[in-house]
Amino acid sequence: MRIQSLLLLGALLAVGSQLPAVFGRKKGEKWGGCPADDGPCLLSVPDQCVEDSQCPLTRKCCYRACFRQCVPRVSVKPGSCPQDQLRCLSPMNHLCHKDSDCSGKKRCCHSACGRDCRDPARG
């Protein structure tokens, strides 16, 4: 009985450790995020992909300069960026380009005048 209990516990732990990987993403979606898209929209180009599963290895299907293409994914910290209700009157100034540019738990978020490092929104 004791061996069966241990085997059952081991099986539950193995399955449970896979649940976040299965339920946290859509089918075919790869880990990581898309890099910031600052490219100007100069011409209409057809999308090279529709979803991550169409991209090789560690690349993700992301918007870049007005169309979707396979690009290297970037690491994303937990939490979401707070909403910024302000309007910017000065030129855009980016203080970061990806979450890994920010210290600790801070995220690289869009603000009224560009991107900067901010604490994730609560709730």
Swiss-Prot record:
Keywords: Disulfide bond, Protease inhibitor, Repeat, Secreted, Serine protease inhibitor, Signal
Any one GO MF annotation of this record: serine-type endopeptidase inhibitor activity
Top-level taxon in the UniProt lineage: Eukaryota
Signal found in the keyword field: yes
GO biological process, one term: innate immune response
WAP domain boundaries: 27-73, 74-121
Location(s) in or outside the cell: Secreted
Entry's transmembrane regions: none
One of the Pfam families matching this protein, by short name: WAP
Presence of the UniProt keyword Nucleus in the record: no
Disulfide links within the chain: C34-C62, C41-C66, C49-C61, C55-C70, C81-C109, C88-C113, C96-C108, C102-C117
Job of this protein: Putative acid-stable proteinase inhibitor.
Protein name: WAP four-disulfide core domain protein 5
